Amino acid sequence: MKKLLGGPGTVCGLLLRIGQCASAAASIGVMVSAKEFSVHTAFCYLIASMGLQLLWSFGLACLDVYALRGKKDLQNPILVSLFVVGDWVTAMLSLAAACSSAGVVVLYEKDIKYCNTQSQYPCLRYEVAVALSFVTWIQIAVSSHVTFWILASV
């Protein structure tokens, strides 16, 4: 198998997973700190999706640390297949959550101008949480493409 930058068991792969954890946790934190987020289903889905992403990325980051400390090779076909499926599933869920939440934010901000008339409504926090979820998705997309290409090189 090819050793690609950002693959499982590499320092770059560990940094990608840590970035995914950090941006997913930040997205959850900002969204939860906004009042009345639970009224909107898309925002609840964003929190659930980012929570799953956080758990998946944290688990793989721990596995990367284990592999790096013990000089283990994580790039065998069975493990990489698991990484590919998990990464693609979480990537699709994260993208769906980010897009649906962005749709709600655009509706309130631009279309019905609810944010202009309701000054106490936390539109900026919603926007930041959605932006962080897109950052998370970009990072998981990179990871999923790298693991896919590693699997394809078997």
Swiss-Prot record:
| Subcellular location(s) per record | Cell membrane
- Work out whether the entry's keyword set contains Membrane: yes
Extracellular side residue ranges read 32-42, 99-129
Which residue ranges are assigned to the Cytoplasmic compartment in the record's topology? 1-10, 64-77, 151-154
Keywords of this entry: Cell membrane, Membrane, Transmembrane, Transmembrane helix
Found, by tissue, as follows: Expressed in the stele of the root.
Pfam families to which the protein is assigned, alphabetical = CASP_dom (PF04535)
Subunit and partners: Homodimer and heterodimers.
Family statement drawn from the similarity comment of this UniProt entry: Belongs to the Casparian strip membrane proteins (CASP) family.
Q: Which PANTHER family does this UniProt record tie to the protein?
A: CASP-LIKE PROTEIN 5B2, CASP-LIKE PROTEIN 5B3
By what name is this protein known? CASP-like protein 5B2
Organism the protein comes from: Arabidopsis thaliana (Mouse-ear cress)
